[in-house]
Amino acid sequence: MSSHGSVICIVGPTASGKSSLSELVAKKLETSVISVDAMQVYRGMDIGTAKTPVEEREVPLLMVDCANISEEYSVQMFQTAARAEAHKLIDAGKTPVFCGGTGLYLDSIVDQMEFPSGSVESPVRTRYEKLAEELGPEGLHELLATKDAASAELI
């Protein structure tokens, strides 16, 4: 984030009370909470993410339910959208309250992190996806066994 506005960051491990505290702070400051949780961005990922149900929210909760689980979503996409939300709040004279436990997501917003734009191709992944199609799961497992028997034993 640029130096023209302050932010509040409430971070910590799962079930440490971040959501409750961030809501209290945001309510007192009459602002919004911006989630920095890599799982809460996905629609339908309500179980296991401790996502505050819509009907229980006392302040706006941003960057939640903004991506489909079946679609590609990257930290760069999150960074762009979350920074835009934060700047809207700052421009309105409000202090964004970031809340969550995904350090990379928070760092991508508050630090000067740059990511390549567009889709990043993974030649290694592409190669092994092609091998999986050709050899099937068993054949791929056999290939793993020739390269790393100990890891193959674990699978």
Where are these regions (language model features)?
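Phosphate/pyrophosphate-binding catalytic cores of soluble transferases and nucleic-acid-acting enzymes
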Residues: M1-I155
